[in-house]
């Protein structure tokens, strides 16, 4: 592959840059249980990449046949984020996927743009990118849950990154 043909590379965060999915799975399962919403670790993996809001709305529809209120969404997602941070902290921090630092340095050396396209809205993970990995990420080259109406698996996050990358 001729790297000069690649103007931008898009990286997901969970499961690509960081091995954070186990913490997400436990946090989602525990917090949903606290709110009497059936949700397993397996459900977390099935919903990987989606925004927290959409995950909560779907769980509420399945369990109670109604939409989640804005207050419920905020409360559940706040609790989930706090639980995730506690789990990651207890484990010594979020683990970087083996080899990803080398890949990022190589991509940077080609002059191509490096983008993060994630369904995450967790500021702790977003803030941790340049601390845990080579400092190749720029805030204006991140598409997160805060930037889209429809999270993954909808193509909107990647289409937005593609449009912004020129």
Predicted regions and their residues:
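N-terminal helical cap/lid subdomain that shapes the substrate entry/recognition surface
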Residues: 3-13, 17-98, 105-110, 123
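Well-ordered alpha-helical segments embedded in enzymatic catalytic cores
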Residues: 99-103, 157-160
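Substrate-recognition "cap/lid" segment bordering the active-site pocket of phosphatases
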Residues: 93, 120-166
